[in-house]
């Protein structure tokens, strides 16, 4: 009886509530959650920058592999989110429960992989990017802790996706806040040596991060067990389902690959910029942390949008699908406009947060001003990427991402670097985004003809 009431309540929200307030209701908590998630990336760098520029560069070089961990966790969660929402839309409670169980199992599998990577691959990873032993050793200490103790990251990410898929985004937001607050409190305590020299600097930043992740994971697991009646999580007699895992990764793998493409991009961009100076690498690392405050709210918007689209796709309601897409694009563009204004008119203010030296300001101020116009185009492609995933066409998202970040961005950055002017390298972002938007619009036209329009018949 309780299960039927929960399903009926969900149908009232996802299937009948007006799209605009529904999208706001589901997205705003996730947008706050994503902004909080951005703090995980930024807070470490802010405090570490007050230790030394070499420590900041080390954390910047760590970002590529760190982003792969996040990609695996989030991408798997995206697949679980889409399949779980679609199952509930189709009133298939058994498949919804099985999806949740297999999602948690995959979180443990992901941890096992990165545990081994953390023990074996840190040294070659850093020395492939820099010959500066001081930078490399600080990076090794930081990333080894983050990977060996990554279980908190994967459990937190998966548990929050389960909450989001069932419309409980405010609980996901609370778990994010818990983890971030713990991280922010512990960061200066560890980084500046108040817990001993062995746990100071970049090592301390990593320790604070993983403790925050475990706290966030614990709260998210609690909320799923006690506050989420739409799914029943029990591992009594559990056996991994190859079919369920396959369906999760039909959507999830393109998302993982798409984010991993970003890691490959940052790895090679660091190589290109290192040809100018370590300061240029630090500036790029700072830019990536800062732009997360612009893009993360849109990722949160997408997390609220995806279950609405997936649910109404399962319920065959094309009008609600179309309206959700239109509103999401409008909100995304408004957010991107705000980000553009901040980067264009106050770059020195945002760079000063990272104790930027005169050399960093000389490179960073023109860099932020040249890069930020691509924000105005990126809002469209980022939203459409999640639309493709929600409608079971995640491969389109992957194609767009690979084209933008590898086929166009890196070759253009390399060619422009041959001018000997680091400022020219930053124009590659705008060039790549123009190509990305054009391709995304082409794919969306195809999706409309093959998936959305047939639902109207």
What is each model feature region?
Residues 77, 146-164, 172-180, 205-220, ...:
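Short runs within selected transmembrane alpha-helices of multi-pass transporters and secretion channels
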Residues 118, 161, 187, 191, ...:
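Structural signal for membrane-spanning alpha-helices in multi-pass inner-membrane proteins
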Residues 14-46, 50-51, 67-79, 83, ...:
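N-terminal transmembrane alpha-helices
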Residues 25-44, 145, 156, 179, ...:
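Transmembrane helical elements of multi-pass membrane transporters/channels
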Residues 1-27, 84-151, 197-253, 309-374, ...:
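Short alpha-helical transmembrane segments in multi-pass integral membrane proteins
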Residues 56-116, 153-172, 283-347, 378-400:
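Small-residue-rich hydrophobic transmembrane alpha-helices
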Residues 35, 39-57, 126-133, 189-200, ...:
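Helix-terminus/linker motif at the lipid-water interface of multi-pass membrane proteins
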Residues 47-67, 134-138, 202-204, 244-251, ...:
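Interfacial/gating helices of multi-pass transporter permease domains
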């Amino acid at each position: 009886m309780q299960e039927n009431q929960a399903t009926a309540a969900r149908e009232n929200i996802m299937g009948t509530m007006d799209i605009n307030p529904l999208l706001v209701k589901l997205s705003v908590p996730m947008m706050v959650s994503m902004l909080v998630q951005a703090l995980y990336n930024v807070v470490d760098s802010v405090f570490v920058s007050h230790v030394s520029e070499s420590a900041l560069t080390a954390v910047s070089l760590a970002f590529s592999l760190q982003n792969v961990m996040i990609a695996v966790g989030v991408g798997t969660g995206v697949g679980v989110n889409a399949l779980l929402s679609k199952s509930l839309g189709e009133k298939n409670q058994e498949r919804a429960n099985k999806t949740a169980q297999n999602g948690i199992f995959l979180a443990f599998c992901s941890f096992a992989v990165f545990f081994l990577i953390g023990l074996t691959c840190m040294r070659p990873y850093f020395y492939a990017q820099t010959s500066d032993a001081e930078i490399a050793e600080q990076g090794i200490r930081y990333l080894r802790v983050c990977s060996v103790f990554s279980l908190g990251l994967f459990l937190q990410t998966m548990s929050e996706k389960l909450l989001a898929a069932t419309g409980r985004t405010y609980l996901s937001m609370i778990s994010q806040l818990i983890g971030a607050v713990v991280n922010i409190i512990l960061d200066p305590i560890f980084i500046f040596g108040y817990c001993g020299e062995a746990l100071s600097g970049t090592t301390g930043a990593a320790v604070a991060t993983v403790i925050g992740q475990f706290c966030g994971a614990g709260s998210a697991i609690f909320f799923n067990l006690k506050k989420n009646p739409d799914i029943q999580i029990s591992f009594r007699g559990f056996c991994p389902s190859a079919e369920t895992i396959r369906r999760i990764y039909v959507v999830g793998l393109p998302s993982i690959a798409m984010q991993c493409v970003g890691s490959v991009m940052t790895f090679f961009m660091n190589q290109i910029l290192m040809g100018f100076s370590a300061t240029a690498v630090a500036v790029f690392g700072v830019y990536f942390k800062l732009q997360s405050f612009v893009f993360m709210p849109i990722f949160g918007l997408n997390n609220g949008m995806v279950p609405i689209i997936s649910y109404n796709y399962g319920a065959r309601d094309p009008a609600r699908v179309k309206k959700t897409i239109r509103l999401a694009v409008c909100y995304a563009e408004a957010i991107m406009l705000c980000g553009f204004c901040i980067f264009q008119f106050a770059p020195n203010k945002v760079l000063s947060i990272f104790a930027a030296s005169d050399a960093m300001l000389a490179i960073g101020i023109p860099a932020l001003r040249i890069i930020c116009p691509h924000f105005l185009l990126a809002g469209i492609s980022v939203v459409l990427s999640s639309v493709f995933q929600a409608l079971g066409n995640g491969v389109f998202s992957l194609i767009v991402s690979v084209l933008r970040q590898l086929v166009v961005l890196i070759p253009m950055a390399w060619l422009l670097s041959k001018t000997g002017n680091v400022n020219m390298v930053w124009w590659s972002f705008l060039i790549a985004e123009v190509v990305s938007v054009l391709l995304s619009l082409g794919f969306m036209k195809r999706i409309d003809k093959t998936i959305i329009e047939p639902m109207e018949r």
